[in-house]
Amino acid sequence: MLKRYLVLSVVTAAFSLPSLVYAAQQNILSVHILNQQTGKPAADVTVTLEKKADNGWLQLNTAKTDKDGRIKALWPEQTATTGDYRVVFKTGDYFKKQNLESFFPEIPVEFHINKVNEHYHVPLLLSQYGYSTYRGS
């Protein structure tokens, strides 16, 4: 009986694994914001994803960071395409909620997607009067 259960569990896991891998890889874009002044994640920050178009920027998606300062799946439910994109972090609202001034009402970070089968992570290290970003993993 135990052997049958073990075999059934292994078979079930083997068929489930590709689905889990696909689910983990299907969203190609994530962001993470850390407040450098407090050393803590920046929760509840609105972030917008936009694609460069001939006449400006086309909004694709908007979400808010979770309690860990993350948006794990910012790419909308559509097929990824190569091109120029930007994420816009609405940092002014974040600091305003804390009764703090900020020099940057929003921080746009432009980047290029040249491989749609890769994951793109955009971390933002934030303070009231400065920021830093890079391509994360």
Swiss-Prot record:
Task: Provide the alphabetized UniProt keywords.
Answer: Hydrolase, Periplasm, Purine metabolism, Signal
EC numbers on record: 3.5.2.17
Q: Which domain of life is it from?
A: Bacteria
GO MF assignments: hydroxyisourate hydrolase activity
What is any one of the record's Gene Ontology cellular component terms?
periplasmic space
Q: Where in the cell is it found?
A: Periplasm
Q: What is the protein's major site of localization?
A: periplasm
Q: SUPFAM superfamilies from the xrefs?
A: Transthyretin (synonym: prealbumin)
Q: Which Gene3D superfamilies match?
A: Transthyretin/hydroxyisourate hydrolase domain (2.60.40.180)
**Which EC class is this protein assigned?**
hydrolase
Provide the catalytic activity annotation. Answer: 5-hydroxyisourate + H2O = 5-hydroxy-2-oxo-4-ureido-2,5-dihydro-1H-imidazole-5-carboxylate + H(+)
What the protein does comes down to: Catalyzes the hydrolysis of 5-hydroxyisourate (HIU) to 2-oxo-4-hydroxy-4-carboxy-5-ureidoimidazoline (OHCU).
Family per UniProt?
A: Belongs to the transthyretin family. 5-hydroxyisourate hydrolase subfamily.
Q: How does it assemble?
A: Homotetramer.
Species name for this entry? Escherichia coli O157:H7
Q: What is this protein called?
A: 5-hydroxyisourate hydrolase
Pfam families in the cross-refs:
Transthyretin (PF00576)
- Chain residues that bind substrate: 32, 70, 134
Q: What is the lineage of its organism?
A: Bacteria, Pseudomonadati, Pseudomonadota, Gammaproteobacteria, Enterobacterales
